[in-house]
Amino acid sequence: MSRLIEQIKQKDACAFTHGGKFHADDVFSSALLLYINPEISITRGNSVPDDFTGIVFDIGRGEFDHHQKDSRIRENGVPYAAFGLLWEAVGADILGEELAVKFDESFVQPLDNNDNTGEKNELATLIGNFNPSWDYEGGSDEAFFQAVSVAGMILENKFERYRGNERADKRVEEVVLALPSSRCIRCAICLSLSGTSKE
């Protein structure tokens, strides 16, 4: 279990992110933390309190922020955003190493890229539409946590889909390997199954 997972799972765990207008990056980061610990307290604000000792993301220029000059970039050129930085730290604990990489490639990276470059992404647009209108009388926190709730459902379903596909692949592989047919046929079937966990 990673150090961050242990910190997130603490009974009095807390996290801090920026206030104001929100994006898919900070929303899915929050949903990920809540997936790991539904009781974690997430606070939004314009600056990180000096005495804050919890997890800080998408603000503060720390480990899980990407707004500094030396922000990290993946080997394939896709820059990390907060969601990607958090996923890198906890993904293997949630899905295992192999599926965590696939999930990063197919789900996390498009959102990170949208946040960093503005490249169009329908899911990011959907989440962004939860931001209240200019003349909304209330604050943005209520809308933010509504968006986090939706993002949480998406994450849960995605995780289960990945796990389900992996279980199906393993089951089919077991059946194929038990067949008395030739090795070539078995190899062809196994090769055709590779990558089916990508969703």
Language-model regions, residue ranges each:
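Glycine-rich, Lys/Arg-enriched anion-binding loops that position phosphate/diphosphate groups
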Residues: 118-199
